[in-house]
Amino acid sequence: MQIRFYRSSDREALQSYHLTDLRFTSHPIQAVADLENRYAILGLVEHQIVTFLILDAGEKKFTYGGQPESLLLRSFSTDEDFQMRGYGSQTLKLLPDFIREYLPMYKSIILGVNERNQVASYLYRETGFSKQPQRILGPAGWQEVYELKI
């Protein structure tokens, strides 16, 4: 598995990204519509997009207790055709080295997870993220805040 930055030439492939449960995330096509201060990242296996996420360098990170050198992880998902194969955790484990190489000015990743999304909370804890004391009221309810130092 590898991760890399999204390119406009990937748009067609994202059209066929299967994601029907949008309770806790947005579809990648929606997410790439606004990339100001954001980096779209793809997880690929044999040139097939299996995961997607946004690293947001904008002001929203401060809502979650982020610092100027933090990135807010948003819109993280695994294509439904590839779920339960470990690609989500592999993507998260590859992120720190990717950021050190391509975005070295950032020193942590911060994110919010809806309290009802226990699968995601477990995934973040298992991949090295630390639960922070604050909670945020997000669009779909209360969110736990997690951070990973890079």
Show where each model-derived region lies.
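Short aromatic/hydrophobic contact patches that present stacked aromatics
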Residues: 75-77, 110-112, 147
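Solvent-exposed beta-strand sheet faces enriched in polar/charged residues
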Residues: 56, 110-112, 132
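Conserved beta-strand-loop-alpha-helix junction that forms the acyl-donor binding cleft
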Residues: 105-121, 137-142
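Active-site acidic-Proline motif in GNAT/NAT acetyltransferases
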Residues: 79-85, 115-116
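Conserved active-site alpha-helix within GNAT-family acetyltransferase domains
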Residues: 89, 115-133
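Short hydrophobic/aromatic beta-strand or adjacent loop that forms the aromatic wall/cage
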Residues: 38, 141-146
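Acetyl-CoA-dependent GNAT
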Residues: 5-75, 79-81, 92, 98, ...
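Extreme N-terminal starter segment of soluble prokaryotic enzymes
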Residues: 1-2
